Amino acid sequence: MRRSGDWVRWLVLGSWVARRAARDPGVRELASNYVAGQEVGDAIKVASRLRRQGLRLGFSYLSADHDPEDTRMVMDELLERLQGASDGSEVAVKPSSLGLKESAGRAGEVLGELCATAERRGAHVTLEMQWPADYDDVIDLYRRVREDHPMLGITLPANLLRVETECRRLGAEGARVRLCVGSYPAGRAVSHVTEHDKALALVRCLRILMESRAYPMLATHDPRIIELAQELALRNGRGPESFEY
């Protein structure tokens, strides 16, 4: 289990965010709380400092470009320069940054290469979920690459109606699953729309994962849901190494 106090997600700043931050001091100040910097070297400095504090790290690359080669090169450089600090770390990658819409085959190749690099460095990769319309394509990409890289994780937004079924399926497979409420808009026909219904869906999905063979990774700041996660872990005999939030 990685508590919110000892697990910090830092972002490698992409081009449009960098330009906006350069123009707007307010954006720059806000981003500094979450963004490691514009260059990989900035992320390395932040990672070194936080590692000395005993924190584990997660990285995302905020790129406006859908260039899979650029994503692979940035993440490869990050993992290489982290050296020993990469052990136990995580890199999250968006399907759009892999060029999934342009070429599913190439996206799979790049994701597989990134997984292989991460494995050599003792790190993990998690594939994020983006627009609901792309759900099937993202799941297909995840399943193809996970055949060779079983530690590849997937982010599931609990606001989508179909995610409960997906949680049962992936739970039976012992997958790494990051569970979040979901931030991309979707219609009432395919998603829960009220905050109350979203929260209930998140709890149901969390329960499914906690009672399964999955490695749940809960992404929430809601203290009530965090407390529930602790209760579910205790009830299901889960040790600190078997889930995180």
Q: Language-model features: where?
A:
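Positively charged, amphipathic and often flexible ligand-engagement surfaces
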Residues: 1-245
